[in-house]
């Protein structure tokens, strides 16, 4: 579960390394985000000559969370770290590569471009 002030890793090659959630989108009282949800992030750490720079405010899709993800068949998956992929205003990824596995739940939330770029879908 991701809430305001949560730090996340960036799972793409946009140039950002760490981001902080500053808003969970989807309602005025919404507190938590999970896999597939869109959040607003501030870039806290970035590499030189990347597509984004420190201090930029962007949208991101949460792709991995430490909290258990329960599936309809009763199975549970869990990741070691929280991670997100930066997106633009048209909901397309800013980077051209995705690092690490992503869960199938992104397919239900219509993030097919992220699914197709990912090296592994769990």
From Swiss-Prot:
GO CC, any one term: cytosolic large ribosomal subunit
Keywords: Ribonucleoprotein, Ribosomal protein, RNA-binding, rRNA-binding
PROSITE patterns: RIBOSOMAL_L14
A Gene Ontology BP annotation from the UniProt entry: translation
InterPro entries: Ribosomal_uL14, Ribosomal_uL14_bac-type, Ribosomal_uL14_CS, Ribosomal_uL14_sf
Alphabetized NCBIfam families for the sequence: rplN_bact (TIGR01067)
Database matches in HAMAP family: Ribosomal_uL14
UniProt family annotation: Belongs to the universal ribosomal protein uL14 family.
Record text on subunit structure and interactions: Part of the 50S ribosomal subunit. Forms a cluster with proteins L3 and L19. In the 70S ribosome, L14 and L19 interact and together make contacts with the 16S rRNA in bridges B5 and B8.
Protein name, entry field: Large ribosomal subunit protein uL14
Organism of provenance: Nitrobacter winogradskyi (strain ATCC 25391 / DSM 10237 / CIP 104748 / NCIMB 11846 / Nb-255)
Lineage, top ranks: Bacteria, Pseudomonadati, Pseudomonadota, Alphaproteobacteria, Hyphomicrobiales
